[in-house]
Amino acid sequence: MKKSLLATVVLVLFAATAMAQQLYVGSYNIRYQNNDDARDGNGWKQRCPVVCAQIAFEHPDVLGTQEVLHGQLKDMLQLLPDYDYIGVGRDDGKKAGEYAAIFYDKQRLRLMDSGHFWLSETPEKPALGWDAACIRICTWGKFRDRKSRKTFFFFNLHMDHMGVVARREGAKLVIERIRQLAGHTPVVLTGDFNVDQRSEVYTIFTTSGLLRDCYEHARQRFAENGTFNNYQADRKTSSRIDHVMVSPAFTVDRYGILTNTYWNGQGDQADRRLPSDHYPVFVHLSF
């Protein structure tokens, strides 16, 4: 009798595990292409193969990216053939300015719907929001797993680096849009918030009842540093301004901030460099 009961429990647990949807997601501010970085030895031409190799190796199912210019987007798609993307340039809703692009594995996931809105008083058109220094945008997609047929929403944003009011009101707007678009469907939110875990904006998200910080709820965590490095490999901080948040429907299995470096140059002339001025965050989820 005891053996029969034990066998039943094992079968139930196995079935529950088999039914759980595994999802690997991430957030990566890849740093926009500019001449100053190139002059300082951190040009996109040398960083791009490293950034893309890192993404290809991790192979997330969905990745929220920030600061992607259109030329960089084309470079990444060429080196990441398993992926497609959604997103528009923030300056005109087409190709101008930075994208908050969402890359997704097109073999694994089917894109059901997508859109974007600006973090401003006029969310449907490009505009500076409140006291922001730059135009800011949020991209979203509705995805369905081709095998399990489970559905989820993915939101990705880049908040302003200057505007305190813009970040606060932008956070409220994102929460409102998540409620409207996703309803009770599981949600992932990624992005460069430009503020850390001690900020008002972080609290707006984590006390909304909709989202939880994956860092705080991970069963297993590898995070030896914060997420902004300013191209300084020896910089140590506890500040996390790049976040991955999920609805309570998700179990956060593993969370990692990956602090990889690479060598630029040959032999004794090589120097250690970082792929971006932000470290990527990757998270294993199940739901």
Predicted features by range, described:
Residues 1-22:
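Bacterial Sec-dependent N-terminal signal peptides
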Residues 18-79, 90-98, 172, 287:
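N-terminal, active-site-proximal structural segment of metallo-dependent hydrolase catalytic domains
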Residues 22-37, 100, 112-117, 150-160, ...:
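Active-site-proximal beta-strand elements of phosphoester/diester hydrolases
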Residues 31, 69, 158-160, 193-196, ...:
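Catalytic metal-binding/acid-base residues of hydrolase active sites
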Residues 62-153, 256-258:
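Structured beta-strand-rich core segments of catalytic domains in phosphoester-bond hydrolases
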Residues 64-66, 88, 188-192, 213-216:
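Active-site neighborhood of phospho(di)ester-bond hydrolases with catalytic His/Asp-centered motifs
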Residues 165, 169, 176-187, 195-287:
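Metal-dependent phosphoester-hydrolase catalytic domains
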